[in-house]
Structure formats: C-alpha cells, structure tokens
C-alpha cells in the first residue's frame, strides 16, 4: 500500500519542478540499518536527504521544505501572513483530526491489525466530523485557501487518499459532494495528476471483521 504521506511531498515537488530521487526501500530493513539511523536517528519514514546532505523527517516538515524551495513557494505556502496561516491551519487540521482516524479505519482492512468495534465506531464518528467540517468550508470555494492549489490542498488529498480507497464508499460520498468535487479537482489537476494517479474510489467498504 502506498505511503499516503508521501504524495503531498511529491506533488509539491512537481509544482516546483523539483526532481526527487526515490531510492529502493524495504520497511523494517532500510530504516533499521546503521547508515539510515546515522542520518535519521528516529528511524522514521518518509525521510529526506538533500544533495547538500541536509536531512529531514516528518512528512509535513519535508513537504513544507520542498514547497518553499521552488518558484511556486508563494502559491503553495501563501502570499501573506493571513493566507499562510490559513494554509497551516488546514495542514494541522488534517494531521490532528483526520489522519489518525483514517489509520484506525484502514489498518485492519489491509491486514495490518485486528478489527475492534469500539475503535471502528469512534474513528468513523471522527471521520464524519472531519468530512462535515470540510463539506461546510468547501461550500464557500472550490479550494481550501484561495483559487490555486496550495500545500493545504495537497496535504488534504494525500490524507484522504486511503480514506477514498477503503472507507468513503458510494453512499458516504453522496453525503459530501463538496469534498468529493474538491478532492477530484486536486488529484486531477494536470500539474499533479501524474503523482496521484487515477482516483481509486471504493464502492462498498468492508464492514466488521468480514
């Protein structure tokens, strides 16, 4: 399963015309090697190393660095204090309110954990809350901040990638037309569609432990 946190980084690089090299990687092996841990002591991925040896972890930090390192920095990160703060607000919203919930809902569905009814119910309630907040906001505009793609949009689309693949099925999508339209607008944007690929929507999500 693709690491959803990487897509926002790759999309920001694409908009900035920055070529990123993605080396071969085996989870639990590469990130436990002495060479990797020397550069990234926490052993976490994604991890970034620049041509000058600059090393960075945490996907939001890497995405911000890549976004700030090219000609579209002001578009991606905001042209003034207010737009920058709004972009950061939405990035934080996805990180705190939606991504952990998506993990709880997806992991058992892809064989990386056991189904737990209490966790499932709580996580689904939280996802509904997050999508409802987005639905209301996106009723005022097609994108999260302004009228061009920002790092907020790229982060949001990356965060919801697994959700649309495994959880937000057709009946659920009908409840959030603004969110679906926004998601498609982001991932089908000609500048980043190569990164996100064709939208992969689940028709009926798996229920219980079936």
UniProtKB/Swiss-Prot annotation:
The EC number(s) this enzyme carries: 2.5.1.-
InterPro entries (UniProt xref): EF-GSTs, Glutathione-S-Trfase_C-like, Glutathione-S-Trfase_C_sf, Glutathione_S-Trfase, Glutathione_S-Trfase_N, GST_C, Thioredoxin-like_sf
Highest rank taxon of the organism: Eukaryota
BP term (GO), one: translational elongation
Domain GST N-terminal: 1-74
Alphabetized CDD domains for the sequence: GST_C_EF1Bgamma_like, GST_N_EF1Bgamma
Residue ranges of domain GST C-terminal in the record: 80-206
Upregulating conditions: Expressed under high amounts of nitrogen via regulation by GLN1. Moreover, components of the fungal-specific velvet complex VEL1, VEL2 and LAE1 act also as positive regulators of expression. Finally, expression is induced under acidic conditions in a PACC-independent manner.
Pfam families, A to Z: GST_C, GST_N
Keywords: Transferase
GO molecular function terms listed in the Swiss-Prot or TrEMBL record: transferase activity
Listed GO CC annotations: cytoplasm; nucleus
Disrupted gene: phenotype observed: Does not alter fusarin C production.
Entry's family note: Belongs to the GST superfamily.
Role: Glutathione S-transferase-like protein; part of the gene cluster that mediates the biosynthesis of the mycotoxin fusarin C. Within the cluster, FUS1, FUS2, FUS8 and FUS9 are sufficient for fusarin production. The other FUS cluster members are not essential for fusarin C biosynthesis.
Record protein name field: Glutathione S-transferase-like protein FUS3
Native source species: Gibberella fujikuroi (strain CBS 195.34 / IMI 58289 / NRRL A-6831) (Bakanae and foot rot disease fungus)
Lineage of the species this protein comes from: Eukaryota, Fungi, Dikarya, Ascomycota, Pezizomycotina
